[in-house]
């Protein structure tokens, strides 16, 4: 469990057993969630799916709704994580964002898209956080 004593909204919990039973990707997504919470993001949802698309993390930060894509690479033999955000992937993410803001009556000026790239270096996570990414 990760929580911040000063902010009850900064809380995300999974048991150690559930973490160990999840696939590798979930481990890195959880690391991204912890990373965001340490920066005072309030996590709203993860793995938000509609037909034809998914957003890894949805959060609130500074009165904005933030949509976050997370990419992980164990090594760089397949390229850096930032290169994996293709036009098709961006199009699918945009479709999900449009659906979400329509469903939840959120203004376009109150949203932002971010990207978290995680690489494993000496068994530790190296995290690059890109804000205001253009879709």
Question: Predicted regions span which residues?
Answer:
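An acidic/histidine-cluster motif and surrounding catalytic segment
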Residues: 1-4
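A cross-taxon signal for low-complexity, glycine/charged-rich
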Residues: 17-20
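Conserved catalytic cores of phosphodiester-cleaving nucleases, focusing on short active-site segments
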Residues: 36, 57-77, 87, 93
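A short acidic/basic microdomain associated with nuclease active sites
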Residues: 38-51
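Structural motif
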Residues: 52, 65-67, 110, 127
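Mid-chain, well-packed structural core segment of small domains
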Residues: 77-106
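Domain-level recognition of nuclease-like catalytic cores that cleave nucleotide substrates
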Residues: 102-135
């Amino acid at each position: 469990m990760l929580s911040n004593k000063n902010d009850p909204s900064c809380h995300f919990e999974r048991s150690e057993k559930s973490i160990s039973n999840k696939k590798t990707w979930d481990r890195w997504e959880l690391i991204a969630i912890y990373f965001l919470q340490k920066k005072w993001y309030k996590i709203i949802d993860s793995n938000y799916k509609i037909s034809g698309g998914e957003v890894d993390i949805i959060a609130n930060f500074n009165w904005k709704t933030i949509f976050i894509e997370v990419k992980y690479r164990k090594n760089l033999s397949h390229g850096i994580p930032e290169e994996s955000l293709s036009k098709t992937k961006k199009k699918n993410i945009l479709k999900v964002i449009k659906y979400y803001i329509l469903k939840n009556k959120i203004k376009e000026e109150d949203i932002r898209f971010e990207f978290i790239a995680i690489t494993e270096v000496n068994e530790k996570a190296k995290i690059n956080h890109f804000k205001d990414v253009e879709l």
